[in-house]
Swiss-Prot record:
GO terms for molecular function: structural molecule activity. It holds the Pfam family WD40. GO terms for biological process: COPII-coated vesicle budding; ERAD pathway; mRNA transport; nuclear pore localization; positive regulation of DNA-templated transcription; positive regulation of ER to Golgi vesicle-mediated transport; positive regulation of protein exit from endoplasmic reticulum; positive regulation of TORC1 signaling. PANTHER family: NUCLEAR PORE COMPLEX PROTEIN SEC13 / SEH1 FAMILY MEMBER (PTHR11024), PROTEIN SEC13 HOMOLOG (PTHR11024:SF2). It is a peripheral membrane protein. Keywords: Cytoplasmic vesicle, Endoplasmic reticulum, ER-Golgi transport, Membrane, mRNA transport, Nuclear pore complex, Nucleus, Protein transport, Repeat, Translocation, Transport, WD repeat. It comes from Meyerozyma guilliermondii (strain ATCC 6260 / CBS 566 / DSM 6381 / JCM 1539 / NBRC 10279 / NRRL Y-324) (Yeast). It comes from the Eukaryota. It is found in: Cytoplasmic vesicle, COPII-coated vesicle membrane; Endoplasmic reticulum membrane; Nucleus, Nuclear pore complex. This is Protein transport protein SEC13.
Length: 290
């Protein structure tokens, strides 16, 4: 584990490596985003500080490199900013998305096969999906997803046979919901409502690989993580990651690239790793003290 000292002046909310693992973007309550060059396993060199938000920055997301060196950020200020690196290695804002009326809590780029598409969730209860066109213009769809606030969202992996836009959202109504695009109505429709938590759903994560079975993980303030999969009839079934409650709130969950390991971070400042055994039960695969 590598510690980067004095990266920000206040609490860091997110840290994400780019596609190649060569750069790290971090964001903080100090309203800034910082870009680090990664050299080897322990050398992180600060190369840029991005200033543009007027409140705490909750999350950052790198676009696929086919679209260039592009980073999206979201903030308590209700804005989503899209940043691009120019050939001289300077960064600038190329798009500002201001359709939400409250904090924007998460941003997530769609699988690159679907184009340059950004998914945003907000405390105003709505989700917006922004399509960025080759000519520099953009269009968006916005709709209500969870009345008292949306905390997170995650795209489904692309089915090459039927590349439908699908994603899952997690809300302050204790629910997760699965959505898909209805192109005829130019909006997203609710496919399924995933009920199982007794407090806010803080994070959702759709496994990136559907080679064997597609999973959704939901992490909640109720100190549980649920794993969801569709049965033969297409109905979503849930399974507790562990029968015991986590020591504190479960803030984030994240699948490995191959989708066979799940990482869970909680209010106890620990990251636990989980994997499915041959009997279909989830078991501990280790723990990291932060």
């Amino acid at each position: 584990m590598v510690t980067i000292a004095n990266a920000h002046d206040e609490l860091i909310h997110d840290a994400v490596l780019d596609y190649y693992g060569k750069r790290l973007a971090t964001c903080s309550s100090d309203k800034t985003i910082k870009i680090f060059e990664v050299e080897g396993t322990e050398n992180y060199q600060l190369t840029e500080t991005l200033v543009g938000h007027e409140g705490p920055v909750w999350q950052v997301a790198w676009a696929h490199p086919k679209f260039g060196s592009i980073l999206a950020s979201c903030s308590y200020d209700g804005k989503v900013l899209v940043w691009k690196e120019s050939p001289d290695r300077s960064w600038s804002i190329i798009s500002e998305h201001k359709v939400h009326q409250a904090s924007v809590n998460s941003v997530s780029w769609a699988p690159h096969e679907l184009g340059a598409v950004l998914l945003c969730t907000s405390s105003d209860g709505r989700v917006s999906v922004v399509d960025f066109n080759d000519d520099g213009t953009s269009t968006h769809i916005i709709f209500e997803a969870h009345k008292i606030g949306v905390n997170s969202a995650s795209w489904a992996p692309v089915d090459t046979k039927s590349p439908v836009r699908r994603f899952v959202t997690g809300g302050s109504d204790n629910l997760a919901k699965v959505w898909s695009l209805d192109a005829s109505k130019s909006t997203y429709v609710e496919e399924a409502k995933l009920e199982g938590h007794t407090d806010w759903v803080r994070d959702v994560c759709w496994s990136p690989s559907a080679l064997v079975r597609s999973y959704i993980a939901t992490a909640s303030q109720d100190r549980t993580v649920l794993i969801w999969h569709q049965d033969g009839e297409g109905k979503w079934q849930k399974q507790k990651l562990t029968e015991e409650l986590f020591p504190d709130v479960c803030w984030r969950c994240s699948w490995s690239f191959s989708g066979n390991i799940l990482a869970v971070s909680g209010g106890d400042n620990k990251v636990s790793l989980w994997k499915e055994n041959l009997q279909g039960k989830w078991e501990s695969a280790g723990e990291v003290d932060q």
